[in-house]
Amino acid sequence: MEPSPALAWLLLLSLVADCLKAAQSRDFTVKDIIYLHPSTTPYPGGFKCFTCEKAADNYECNRWAPDIYCPRDTRYCYTQHTMEVTGNSISVTKRCVPLEECLSTGCRDSEHEGYKICTSCCEGNICNLPLPRNETDATFATTSPINQTNGHPHCVSVIVSCLWVWLGLTL
């Protein structure tokens, strides 16, 4: 009996398919987040953050985070990651916070305990998916200006004056 190429291909494809099933990731993807976030909000500008208190790692935090909207008096998603010197997670805390809790992001070493704590904040729906692991990740990322003033009052008078001159009028 001679070997069948079709049978060999079938066996090879079956083996590859089994390997692909075994290589699934434990982390969430952007596609998962879009599925989690519905299009309606309880109030204008409503948003969600992953929330957990001292979870063992990022997967445990994101997996069991309650699917609720942040309170109106909050604006950002906060993440605090405590890790060993090797980078292994000790604890993960995520929550909705006001601006004041996001003013000291970054990483610091705990010399006596031998671990590092990195803190980050972000603005947006479920934006706190990843963990901060170093100074590059431990940032305060916003999509809108933090200091929302009404602009400079003298700018309006300058613009009006320029329009008057351009139109050939005098003040």
Swiss-Prot record:
CDD domains: TFP_LU_ECD_LYPD6
Disulfide bonds: C49-C77, C52-C61, C70-C96, C102-C121, C107-C118, C122-C127
GO CC terms of this entry: cytoplasm; dendrite; extracellular region; membrane raft; perikaryon; plasma membrane; side of membrane; synapse
GO molecular function, one term: acetylcholine receptor regulator activity
Pfam families per UniProt: UPAR_LY6_2 (PF16975)
Tissue-by-tissue expression: Detected in the frontal cortex and hippocampus (at protein level). Highly expressed in the brain and spinal cord, as well as dorsal root and trigeminal ganglia.
Region forming the signal peptide: 1-25
Places the protein is found: Secreted; Cytoplasm; Cell membrane; Synapse, Synaptosome
UniProt KW keywords: Cell membrane, Cell projection, Cytoplasm, Disulfide bond, Glycoprotein, GPI-anchor, Lipoprotein, Membrane, Secreted, Signal, Synapse, Synaptosome
Entry's free-text remark on domains: The UPAR/Ly6 domain is sufficient for inhibiting alpha-3:beta-4 and alpha-7-dependent nAChR currents.
PANTHER family: LY6/PLAUR DOMAIN-CONTAINING PROTEIN 6, LY6_PLAUR DOMAIN-CONTAINING PROTEIN 6
Name used for this protein in its record: Ly6/PLAUR domain-containing protein 6
Organism (species): Mus musculus (Mouse)
Gene name as annotated: Lypd6
